[in-house]
Amino acid sequence: MPPDPRPIPRFIADSTQEGIPHGRFAERLGETFRGICAEIEDLPDGVELPAEFDWYPERAWGGRVWVPGTARADGPEGTLELFGHVSYVQVTDSDPTDFRAHADFTDVLAEDNAGWKIDLNDEVIGRWRGENGRAGAVTLVWGRPLVQGAVAATAELDRETVDQEEISNGRFTLLALDALEAYGDDIYMQVKLWNRRAQELASESLYA
């Protein structure tokens, strides 16, 4: 086969191996995530941090395992959503180490947006560099389908699938390149949901 005129890394992350965290490990993740939530500088005064978080399937990339999370928090001005991720190093036959976390919040909620078909969050966690100035943002994406019948989620760049995962307990995690540079027009990720018949149910940009 001839050289690819547009060499883009595809399926750069390990697929989920453990699924949604639970039990004591979920508690360990929660301690780390709660601590970083308390450090959000512009979090309104009076917001009560939740005791539990909704975790999403883990993905591994760049020597770390990434676990997204979300939670609702009540404050004096109404309900907020906390979102972010915990990452750690997992060595075979050893306990996880080097826990790190990132968190932010939003007052834009899915239930207030009837037109949404996917409730999405994303965070750039790295950068890929190619030849001749080509580059892209390594992006962790997690979310929930807001339509019935979704069994899988995919990430696409210019109609080409670059990551995919089954939906587990109504949640999914993707990890792929976004915002490609120096390929002519900039190329951005599109997240799609699919049913068991491989029919597209929804398509959303990270920039909607």
Task: Give residue ranges: language-model regions.
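Long, contiguous interaction/targeting segments characteristic
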Residues: M1-N121
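Extended aliphatic helical segments
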Residues: V47, V65-V67, V86-V91, V108, ...
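Short, ordered beta-strand-loop transition motifs
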Residues: P57-R64, G133-A135, I167-S168
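Extracellular ectodomain segments of secreted/surface proteins
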Residues: V108-W142
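Ser/Thr-rich low-complexity repeats and stalk/linker segments
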Residues: R134-A208
